[in-house]
C-alpha cells in the first residue's frame, strides 16, 4: 500500500526542508504524530539517525511511540524515514521538494513495506481505508507547513 499528496508552497526549498527535516517540528504539522525526539545523541537530520515519534492513531488513539530511522537526507531535495519494528522497516515516509514557478512543490508519500502482515492488514482489516486517511492527513500536514512557510 502506498500513496502521496503534493502541495505547492510559495517559499524556497531550503526553508521548507529545514522545517520538515527537524523532526521536533512534527507535532506542529502532523494530525497523528504529536511529538518527536532525536535518539542516540542525534541533534539533527542525518542519514541513519534515529528518532522516535509519539503517535495518536487516527487522532483519537491508541497512543504509542514508534522508532524511526532516517533513510534519505539531501537538503533541500528530500527527507525520508522508515518506521521500524523489531529492527525491520514497516512503513516508509518520504518528502520530495522540487522547484516550481514561484516556489516549491512538496510531495509527501508513504509506502508500507511489503510483507505477509501488510497484505493481511490491507485485505482483512480495511487497509484501503487507512490509505485514504493517510492521503488526507498528508495533505493536511503539507497545508500546515505551507501556512507557516508562507507567513514568514
Predicted regions and their residues:
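Hydrophobic ligand-binding cavity/cleft-lining segments
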Residues: 1-43, 144
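Exposed loop/turn and edge beta-strand positions of beta-sandwich/beta-sheet ligand-binding modules
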Residues: 3, 64, 91
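Generic structural detector for well-ordered beta-strands
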Residues: 6-10, 37, 54, 69, ...
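Amphipathic alpha-helical protein-protein interaction surfaces
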Residues: 12, 22-25, 75, 102, ...
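Glycine-rich portal/gate segments that line the openings of hydrophobic small-molecule binding cavities
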Residues: 37-88, 100-105, 139-152
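Beta-strand/loop substructures that line and gate deep hydrophobic ligand-binding cavities in soluble
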Residues: 83-140, 145
Amino acid at each position: 500500500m502506498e500513496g502521496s499528496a503534493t502541495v505547492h508552497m510559495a517559499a524556497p526549498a531550503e526553508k521548507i526542508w529545514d522545517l520538515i527535516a527537524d523532526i521536533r517540528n512534527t507535532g506542529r504539522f502532523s494530525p497523528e504524530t504529536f511529538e518527536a525526539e532525536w535518539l542516540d545523541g542525534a541533534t539533527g537530520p542525518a542519514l541513519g539517525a534515529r528518532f522516535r515519534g509519539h503517535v495518536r492513531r487516527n487522532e483519537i488513539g491508541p497512543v504509542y511511540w514508534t522508532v524511526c530511522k532516517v533513510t534519505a537526507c539531501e537538503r533541500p531535495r528530500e527527507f525520508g524515514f522508515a518506521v521500524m519494528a523489531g529492527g525491520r522497516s514497516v512503513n516508509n515516509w518520504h518528502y520530495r521538494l522540487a522547484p516550481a514557478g514561484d516556489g516549491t512543490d512538496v510531495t509527501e508519500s508513504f509506502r508500507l513495506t511489503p510483507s505477509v502482515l501488510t497484505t493481511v492488514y490491507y485485505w482483512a482489516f480495511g487497509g484501503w481505508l487507512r490509505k485514504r486517511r493517510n492521503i488526507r492527513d498528508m495533505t493536511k500536514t503539507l497545508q500546515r507547513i505551507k501556512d507557516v512557510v508562507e507567513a514568514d
